UniProtKB/Swiss-Prot annotation:
Class of enzymatic activity (EC top level): oxidoreductase
This protein's name: Methane monooxygenase component A gamma chain
Family matches, as InterPro entries: Me_mOase_g, Me_mOase_g_dom1, Me_mOase_g_dom2, Me_mOase_sf_g, MethMoxGammaMmoZ
The organism's taxonomic lineage, starting at the top: Bacteria, Pseudomonadati, Pseudomonadota, Gammaproteobacteria, Methylococcales
A Pfam family it matches: MeMO_Hyd_G
Disulfide bridge partners, by residue number: none
Database matches in SUPFAM superfamilies: Methane monooxygenase hydrolase, gamma subunit
Species of provenance: Methylococcus capsulatus (strain ATCC 33009 / NCIMB 11132 / Bath)
Amino acid sequence: MAKLGIHSNDTRDAWVNKIAQLNTLEKAAEMLKQFRMDHTTPFRNSYELDNDYLWIEAKLEEKVAVLKARAFNEVDFRHKTAFGEDAKSVLDGTVAKMNAAKDKWEAEKIHIGFRQAYKPPIMPVNYFLDGERQLGTRLMELRNLNYYDTPLEELRKQRGVRVVHLQSPH
């Protein structure tokens, strides 16, 4: 690939090679799930791919989608996750966990965890979007109407956020 800085770089080239080696749905789905756990959401384990993670995730998603279409028949494609789980059962279990959540922080972790583990193409879109609706509704109920009235500094304190300034404020 031509070296054009951020849009084409050694990191992306390395991931293109890794992704090309994936030849089974099981391997590709597991790599996508682990990649999301390691490099996406506020709960990520690493920021090393900060400029490239969305591009890499999209390439992994493409690979999983192609392998899933080859591996599954039409019924399974529309009703099972890439791991072979019944999508409705997975969704029902996640919604039950969300409904049992006692506070907004627990609910946020459930919702984000669902996205990391099951965002399409892992879960069929029809189940995933219904899950997003149900989980998001419950999360907003737990956050309550005053969530957006809470000052930013108070939200940071509640979450244990430490602000780091890379340069001095003007």
